Design a protein with these regions (language model features):
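Post-signal peptide N-terminal regions of Sec-secreted extracellular proteins
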Residues: 33-163
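N-terminal prepro-regions of secreted/extracellular proteins
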Residues: 1-55
Length: 163
């Protein structure tokens, strides 16, 4: 008989066999996990974290909205935490970014099935030049998180153009 415990044990064994990255190590290293999608020059500027719970209040996720300096990508990371998610869930994520008028705007909407203790990284590309902040936001259901950043140098949180 296949149980939740046996499936979880199989999943953990597979995770360890494929590079030794257990679920806990991934959740504790958002920069490293995001770097695979957002590039090695990934740098956290600011993040917004919003718990997402169902009617029972048992399930939750964390939305981490952050910036990448590589390929002008702004990244929104949805992290699923806790065993209450069950083995599989449908997750709908909407990402949008905006800035000044001469900046390229765009939106990327995606959905997928996520395993327990896993994360999904969604990206939206835009031109990272300009003197006004660029904002990236992620929405999951009725919960959302966002962050703003600037290019160039200065005291405010900024993202750096890729070299």
């Amino acid at each position: 008989m296949i149980t939740r415990k046996s499936v979880f044990q199989l999943f953990m064994a597979f995770s360890l066999a494929c590079g030794g990255l257990g679920a806990v190590s991934v959740l504790n290293a958002p920069e490293a996990a995001a770097a695979n999608t957002c590039g090695t020059s990934y740098r956290m500027v600011k993040d917004g974290r919003v718990p997402v719970k169902d009617a029972s209040g048992e399930r939750f996720a964390t939305i981490e909205v952050s910036f990448s300096s590589k390929d002008n990508q702004n990244c929104a990371i949805l992290v699923k935490e806790g065993r209450h998610w069950g083995l599989e869930e449908n997750v709908n994520v909407s990402i949008a970014f905006s800035g000044d008028q001469d900046r390229q705007h765009g939106q990327d909407t995606d959905s997928g099935r996520m395993k327990e203790y896993s994360r999904a990284v969604y990206t939206a590309k835009g031109v990272a030049a300009g003197d006004k902040p660029i904002k990236v936001s992620a929405t999951v259901g009725n919960a959302s998180a966002s962050a703003e950043g600037w290019d160039g140098s200065g005291n405010a949180p900024r993202i750096t153009n890729p070299k």
